A protein has these predicted regions:
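Alpha-helical transmembrane segments
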Residues: 2-15, 33, 45-57, 117-122, ...
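Hydrophobic alpha-helical transmembrane segments
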Residues: 19-28, 135-139
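Transmembrane alpha-helical segments
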Residues: 34, 38, 78-85, 164-176, ...
Length: 221
């Protein structure tokens, strides 16, 4: 077992489960979906490359949940991380190499240069400083599930993306090392599906509010 992978799996799983249990629209249903997704992503570790970019434009339900600090995509990425790092901690032996040799389905986290990691960590550190400044300007940190844009948790909303990206970066490296062509193909399909979903949502929104071909009425998509 890799201790860092175990720790990341536990933290990601616990955080994702906590968000699911406090989800405003049916916490029991969301918790059940999280548990099912854990199993799916553990069984098919590259599935997230298709689903995350495909679902990203269409799973934001903030108008109905009232959440802006936390989003459905946060839960999805935390589930991906929990399953991926669990598989990395308890690797499954598979034959994926061209010569038939066996290797771990989830190898280590290497593959990115020290300079690249240093730059990423420096950017993450600068984000933490910015989040701290945001807390200070909002009158100090106070936690709340339904805070708005002028309250402390808005800094968390703005700063979390870099940390979610860094969280899944080793999983992307692992997928590319195992089956580079398949990983890139799944990601490409996911991006295309996400673009199609965003385009359809835009067409629906304009049709619903102004009319698809009405370019005279003031409206911001």
């Amino acid at each position: 077992m890799l201790l860092p992978a175990v720790v990341l799996a536990l933290i990601s799983g616990a955080t994702g489960l906590a968000l699911a249990m406090h989800y405003p629209l049916g916490p029991a249903v969301m918790t059940a979906l999280v548990l099912a997704a854990w199993g799916a992503f553990f069984a098919w570790p590259q599935l997230w490359l298709l689903l995350v970019p495909a679902l990203l434009p269409i799973i934001g339900l903030a108008p109905w949940t009232g959440w802006i600090t936390f989003e459905e995509v946060d839960i999805l990425i935390l589930v991906v991380a929990a399953s991926g790092y669990a598989r990395m901690a308890w690797p499954v032996r598979t034959n994926t190499t061209g010569d038939g040799s066996s290797r771990d389905a989830m190898p280590g986290m290497s593959g990115v240069s020290v300079l690249a990691w240093l730059l990423a960590l420096l950017f993450a550190a600068s984000t933490l400083v910015a989040v701290g400044r945001g807390f200070a300007d909002a009158g100090g940190f106070s936690f709340g599930w339904f805070q708005g844009y002028l309250e402390p948790m808005n800094s968390v909303r703005l700063g979390k993306s870099i940390f979610l990206a860094l969280l899944v970066l080793p999983l992307w490296q692992s997928a590319v090392r195992q089956q580079p062509e398949r990983a890139q193909r799944l990601l490409a399909w996911g991006l295309m599906l996400g673009l199609a979903g965003a385009a359809m949502a835009t067409v629906w929104e304009r049709t619903a509010f102004t009319g698809l071909l009405n370019f005279s009425t003031d409206y911001r998509t």
